[in-house]
Amino acid sequence: MTKGILGKKIGMTQIFDEAGRAIPVTVIEAGPCVVVQKKTVEKDGYSAIQVGFEDIKESKLNKPLRGHFAKHGVKPKRFLRELRLKDADKYEVGQEIRVDIFQPGEKVDVTGISKAKGFQGVIKRHGQQRGPMSHGSMYHRRVGSMGSNTFPARTFPGKKMPGRMGGERVTVLNLQVVKVDPDRNLLLVKGSVPGNKNSLLIIRDSVKSK
């Protein structure tokens, strides 16, 4: 990974290309971010930068975080994330990272926390087929068979069962950058990204782009 930025999901809309085709896009408020800390191979064993996004009152931070920002001379930020970059040496503490590091046509990977759905059954959670809905059926939306009785006489680990759905870290790969608006710190990517509106996103250059 050579570049990355933090952002906030605004929502989805559509724009039209030169041929008049509608393109579904997600609008992301990306940056500006500030480099809070640098990590080097000599001192930390790996190369990375710690970036902060979105200003916050100092009174809302705990004492260790207040000291962390004061030590590096950076204004307090709401979000802190670490980006492991190959060329972290070119960044300096206090340097601002803006959305114009990306250009239209590039491919990016977007990471976020998926929408939480609460406790759900196997049909919604895993896409399983329901049972017969006719009269006399013993089940409709139940799990079905969970294993044999005599052998192995247990349910194998990993069996798809009802449970809490969503609220997990999800990365969507190879999304195309459609438009960049540096004046308003907006990044438009083709397709959908995980998370609710105003949720935190990590945008990085694609690692598997062809």
Curated annotation (Swiss-Prot):
GO terms for cellular component: cytosolic large ribosomal subunit. Gene3D superfamilies: 3.30.160.810, Translation factors. It holds the Pfam family Ribosomal_L3. GO terms for biological process: translation. Keywords: Ribonucleoprotein, Ribosomal protein, RNA-binding, rRNA-binding. It comes from the Bacteria. InterPro entries: Ribosomal_uL3, Ribosomal_uL3_bac/org-type, Transl_B-barrel_sf. One of its GO terms (molecular function) is structural constituent of ribosome. The keyword Ubl conjugation does not apply. The keyword Signal does not apply. Coiled coil: none annotated. Belongs to the universal ribosomal protein uL3 family. Part of the 50S ribosomal subunit. Forms a cluster with proteins L14 and L19. One of the primary rRNA binding proteins, it binds directly near the 3'-end of the 23S rRNA, where it nucleates assembly of the 50S subunit. NCBIfam families: L3_bact (TIGR03625). This is Large ribosomal subunit protein uL3. It comes from Caldicellulosiruptor bescii (strain ATCC BAA-1888 / DSM 6725 / KCTC 15123 / Z-1320) (Anaerocellum thermophilum). The lineage of its organism: Bacteria, Bacillati, Bacillota, Bacillota incertae sedis, Caldicellulosiruptorales.
